[in-house]
Amino acid sequence: MSIPNHLRYSEEHEWVKTEGNQVVIGITHFAQSELGDIVFVELPEVGATLEANEPFGSVESVKTVSELYAPVSGKVVAVNEELSDQPELVNESPYEGAWMVKVELSDASEVEKLLTAEKYAEMTNQD
């Protein structure tokens, strides 16, 4: 699967899509393929505050449990409730249906510090 150019990426394999003063966050195709079949997703509540580079939830697969790290700081304004009933969406549609949280940014400049698609591809040895 190609890496979408319109997104930014963290070194912990989260993607960020900017929508005005908010961002949508999910995990990358690379991350879900490394994890294997996702069986459970734990996400924060609406209203929770995220701090960049700090854990904000977890993803459980048949192989392991992996923490999710916030690529940016801000307040959670929406959570993808579908993932509690259909965690497999993370495997099936990591960049669309399986977004995890929407966050109102506290510092928009944090987005610019994230990796471009090209840099993320280099980091993960994907073309």
Curated annotation (Swiss-Prot):
Belongs to the GcvH family. Its cofactor is (R)-lipoate. PROSITE patterns: BIOTINYL_LIPOYL (PS50968), LIPOYL (PS00189). The modification N6-lipoyllysine is found at residue 63. InterPro entries: 2-oxoA_DH_lipoyl-BS, Biotin_lipoyl, GCV_H, GCV_H/Fam206, GCV_H_sub, Single_hybrid_motif. The glycine cleavage system catalyzes the degradation of glycine. The H protein shuttles the methylamine group of glycine from the P protein to the T protein. This is Glycine cleavage system H protein. Transmembrane segments: none annotated. One of its GO terms (biological process) is glycine decarboxylation via glycine cleavage system. The keyword Protein transport does not apply. The gene is gcvH. HAMAP family: GcvH. Pfam families: GCV_H. The keyword Transmembrane does not apply. Residues 22-104 form the Lipoyl-binding domain. Binds 1 lipoyl cofactor covalently. Keywords: Lipoyl. GO terms for cellular component: cytosol; glycine cleavage complex.
